[in-house]
Amino acid sequence: MTAPYACQPEESRGRRWPERMSTFRSPWQRDRDRIIHSSAFRRLKHKTQVFVEHEGDYYRTRLTHTIEVAQVARTIAGALGLNTDLAETVALAHDLGHPPFGHTGEDALAALMAPYGGFDHNAQALRIVTRLERHYADFDGLNLTWESLEGIAKHNGPVTGDLPYALAEVNAEWDLELHTNASAEAQVAAVADDVAYNHHDLHDGLRAGLFTEADLAELPVVGEALARVDALHPGLEPMRRRHEALRRVFGVMVEDVIAVAQNRLASLQPQNVQEIRDMEGPIIRFSKPLYQNLKAIKLFLFQRMYRAPSVVVERRRVTEMLNGLFPLFLDDPSKMPRTWFQAAEAAGDETGRARVVLDYVAGMTDRFAIQEAQRLLG
């Protein structure tokens, strides 16, 4: 049984295009299934976080990251009496809008799109699930429920100021109440993203040799976990020691989020989901001490992993690829596949063409972007 402040399936605001209710699945189970079966979700397999795909099969991809986020989201949501299906749905959708080459790709496309309304991966995820997926006879997109769209749009909290055009377009058609907090389920998905990032970037950085366990021993939380493992399992082989310590770090983060939320919910006693949306600030978050410790870990990762010389070289290389492909397609849309060429021709002006090119390039996998750059740029 879910808590009164959880999103209730029977109270869903529904879909943009009304559909008959399923006999066997809740609205958010259907949303989840549509996301899993989408083309954009499958492409996440060949989109990377930090390391370009061809560098190794071990490193996380957007797909493995997304699965990890969904697992964490279900765990936290279940512990708090929230709707686990909605939390999982938002988690599964949260990275659909990421372009090839991780954050490097996003930075490159944001710069290229600056004259044409900008680029934001959360807004692009909304565009994918409302426009670009074309599997159904009666509508474009996946026709997700309002609650799922809200969770995607507010992944980083309430949205104020100038809106990315993709988000403004959707919000103009269906008010997502961008000025309010997201549901508790969507907040859980956002925090689960942070948990998964912090955990697996430590794993991947160690695997890549960008830092050592001795380096991690100097960090808050991680150092304590390593010391605890050494006390309980002296002489443990290095691989097991590493995994055991990072497993404990993972547990610390999840348990902290649950404890903080339980205390805040007990104190504030919200009676429905709207009270969650109208609160001052999020109800799902890390404690202040852990938040500060995680900032130190993120700074370490930024300096030793994201700005590692080998990663910086790769960032430059893939940025050059996108800086070559985007203007090439913008100047000559016929170099894109026929359907994309036709869409660009029908767009009317340069801004419209640029947005079509963005949709095409942002949808590429790392592998395909590299192949296209080799084919078209030499």
Swiss-Prot record:
Domain HD residue range list: 62-198
Keywords: Hydrolase
SUPFAM superfamilies in the cross-refs: HD-domain/PDEase-like (SSF109604)
Matches recorded under Gene3D superfamilies: Hypothetical protein af1432
Residues spanning the signal sequence: none
Entry's Gene Ontology molecular function annotations: dGTPase activity
InterPro entries, sorted: dGTPase, dGTPase-like, dNTPase_2, HD/PDEase_dom, HD_domain, PHydrolase_assoc_dom
An annotated GO BP: dGTP catabolic process
Top-rank lineage group of the source organism: Bacteria
Family, similarity comment: Belongs to the dGTPase family. Type 2 subfamily.
Protein name as annotated: Deoxyguanosinetriphosphate triphosphohydrolase-like protein
